[in-house]
Amino acid sequence: MIPGNDPILLTPGPLTTSLRTREAMLRDWGSWDAAFNRMTHGVCADLLKIVHGENDYVCVPLQGSGTFAVEAALGTLVPRQGCVLVPNNGAYCARLIRILQRMGIAYIELVLREDEPVSAAAVEDAFNRHSRISHVAHVHLETSAGLLNPLDDIAAVCQRHGKSLIVDAMSSFGALPIDLRRGGIDALISASGKCLEGVPGMGFVIMRRSLLEDSEGRSPSLALDLHDQYVYMRKTTQWRFTPPTHVVAALREALDQFGAEGGQPARGARYARNCAALVGAMKALGFEPFLKPEVQAPVIVTFHAPRDPAWHFAAFYAAVREAGYVLYPGKLTQVETFRVGCIGAIDANELLNAAAAIGHALERLGIRVR
């Protein structure tokens, strides 16, 4: 699927993009140009449709990586006197805590193992033990292991207890079903360079309109103030500060391809096929996934590193990279692992080819897996 000699990025973002998406960045756009502003509006409208949020939600785009959007959402939506429950089963959950610490917002950490999904019962127990909790910051797909946390059950318990739910859907948006009509979710955060198969550089937050309109002056940051961004864009149709024009154009093209493929169901099905092909081929080489199948998301798979003394990730990475595939280092704290992504403009055959390249690298380096 990839022309030329570009490497295949088996990472959770940036990821391999289609030629059409790259070609969309060949045109320059004026940041105040009416055509560009219409494109931004269309992109936001399409993002809302993916999660069925057209009626009660708004989509606010923001320059920068997904973490910029996460910090913007927390700073804009959580009052200074609020208290945020953070279920923590990985590095990206821990990042939420670091953001809250920097902003001086109170939080309660729900500590979980790196292979343990959060449960609605555990969240409800935290509500019962800590009445001061006002918000929950929940990572839908913890990319450090590829762990899928439940969403609908968490949303239901938050709604039942009157808690505001902010969801980091960075690595699930577009690949896994999310339906805002079911209720319980106040904000949803993602970015251009993940499962939508755009390029990095634009985050976005989908929020209940009523909550955003009540958040004026709350953000401690000028650049990350989503209320200010929303009001300015409504008034002028323009971004407050220089927009990532080429990123928006690439996302526009990527969304067109997303729709032509069949939307979220088709995108998710392709990624599931990719994941199944990868896991099967890697098991044949002797590798074992870190997660159980029932909690494995079809986005990135974490594998246990070989125990062979000849194993060194840097040398292994370089050998696989030489064959045209870029892997991802492990991000777990307890065991040595590495990760292989299943997403991007690739199919199951590409994952089988990648596994073959991994097998050749093991032979070349004299590494025994079993």
From Swiss-Prot:
Modified residues (N6-(pyridoxal phosphate)lysine): 194
Catalytic activity line of the entry: (2-aminoethyl)phosphonate + pyruvate = phosphonoacetaldehyde + L-alanine
Keywords from the UniProt entry: Aminotransferase, Pyridoxal phosphate, Pyruvate, Transferase
Any Pfam family: Aminotran_5
Any Gene Ontology biological process: organic phosphonate catabolic process
EC number(s) on file: 2.6.1.37
Classification via InterPro entries: Aminotrans_V_dom (IPR000192), NH2EtPonate_pyrv_transaminase (IPR012703), PyrdxlP-dep_Trfase (IPR015424), PyrdxlP-dep_Trfase_major (IPR015421), PyrdxlP-dep_Trfase_small (IPR015422), SP_NH2Trfase/AEP_transaminase (IPR024169)
A single GO molecular function term of this UniProt record: 2-aminoethylphosphonate-pyruvate transaminase activity
Cofactor: pyridoxal 5'-phosphate
Superkingdom field: Bacteria
Family: Belongs to the class-V pyridoxal-phosphate-dependent aminotransferase family. PhnW subfamily.
Reported function: Involved in phosphonate degradation.
Complexes and interactors: Homodimer.
PANTHER family: 2-AMINOETHYLPHOSPHONATE--PYRUVATE TRANSAMINASE (PTHR42778:SF1)
Alphabetized HAMAP family for the sequence: PhnW_aminotrans_5
Protein name: 2-aminoethylphosphonate--pyruvate transaminase 2
Name of the gene this protein is made from: phnW2
